From Swiss-Prot:
Sites bearing N6-acetyllysine, chain numbering: 109
Organism: Homo sapiens (Human)
UniProt feature, compositional bias: Basic and acidic residues: 12-32
Protein name: cAMP-regulated phosphoprotein 19
Listed Pfam families: Endosulfine (PF04667)
Compartment annotation: Cytoplasm
Subunit structure: Interacts (when phosphorylated at Ser-62) with PPP2R2D. Interacts with SNCA. Interacts with PPP2R2A; the interaction is direct and this interaction inhibits PP2A activity.
Coiled coil segments of this chain: none
Length: 112
């Protein structure tokens, strides 16, 4: 029993020390609550904001709306089969494979 008494005393001393440390913070908090009583009452903001959050906003801005609208159009329209079956990347083009450039109608000012 004598071993428990010093531990209890040390626990009480620690509690007193914590109270001394936190008491200035609690005093400052009490001052602020007295000065601004309406701040801590309503978590979640104004009634307008709460109503908007409950309603659930579907689109952030007009860009989101237009993208969703375009997705809906893409789902409704039947996709046309591609008439070109050309596969790209079969070979590396060489200068002989490329078509010739057409001469420009306007004379270049750099060639002058």
């Amino acid at each position: 029993m004598s071993a428990e008494v010093p531990e209890a005393a040390s626990a009480e001393e620690q509690k007193e020390m914590e109270d001394k440390v936190t008491s200035p913070e609690k005093a400052e908090e009490a001052k602020l609550k007295a000065r601004y009583p309406h701040l801590g009452q309503k978590p979640g903001g104004s009634d307008f904001l709460r109503k908007r959050l409950q309603k659930g906003q579907k689109y952030f801005d007009s860009g989101d709306y237009n993208m969703a609208k375009a997705k809906m159009k893409n789902k409704q329209l039947p996709t046309a089969a591609p008439d070109k079956t050309e596969v790209t990347g079969d070979h590396i083009p060489t200068p002989q494979d490329l078509p010739q450039r057409k001469p420009s109608l306007v004379a270049s000012k750099l060639a002058g």
